[in-house]
């Protein structure tokens, strides 16, 4: 990766918005913006999961003598575990996006190689495909499921 695109050596201007950046697509400032977004998102998810481990999993709610209370606690516990599993998968996608930034592949569609719109990346920084490619992919998946 070239020094001109190294996000870790770039200082992000205050109130920076990559949609207003008229420079080269995925220049070092854009990469740093998304790198910071991904790091903050991952840190937030990790904090939440630590809270779950400390609160939910160590709870004595599942040991309640009343069946209705215990069933309710088990349902809450199962929902919390499913949520944490989804977040674990999301953290994996965030880690892959961070690797793509370091490898200079971030922001480009893995299917077509075209740039992914900045608006899409701001909404979903882990996006790996353009909106059009994602829609095609989802239509193909739906067709295969319907067969």
What do these predicted ranges mean?
Residues 119-123:
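Short Cys/His-rich "knuckle" micro-motifs
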Residues 115-117, 138:
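Short functional micro-motifs and their immediate structural scaffolds
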Residues 2-103, 140-141, 146-147:
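Interaction interfaces in information-processing and related assembly proteins
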Residues 109-112, 130:
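Short cysteine-rich clusters marking metal-coordination/redox-active sites
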Residues 33, 111, 125:
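Amphipathic alpha-helical recognition patches that constitute DNA-binding helices
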Residues 88, 106, 127:
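Residues immediately within or flanking Cys/His clusters that coordinate Zn2+
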Residues 127-134:
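Cysteine-rich micro-motifs
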Residues 134-140:
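Extended, non-catalytic scaffold segments that flank or surround catalytic motifs
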């Amino acid at each position: 990766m070239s020094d001109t695109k190294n996000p870790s050596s770039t200082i992000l201007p205050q109130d920076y918005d990559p949609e207003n950046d008229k420079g080269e697509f995925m220049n070092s400032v854009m990469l740093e913006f998304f790198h910071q977004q991904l790091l903050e998102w991952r840190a937030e998810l990790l904090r939440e999961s630590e809270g779950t481990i400390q609160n939910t999993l160590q709870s004595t709610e599942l040991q309640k003598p009343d069946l209705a209370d215990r069933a309710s606690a088990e349902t809450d516990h199962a929902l919390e575990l499913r949520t944490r599993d989804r977040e674990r998968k999301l953290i994996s996608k965030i880690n892959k996006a961070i690797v793509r930034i370091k490898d200079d592949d971030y922001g480009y569609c893995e299917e077509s190689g075209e740039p992914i719109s900045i608006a899409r990346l701001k909404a979903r920084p882990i996006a790996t495909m353009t909106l059009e490619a994602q829609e095609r992919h989802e239509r193909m998946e739906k067709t295969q499921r319907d067969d």
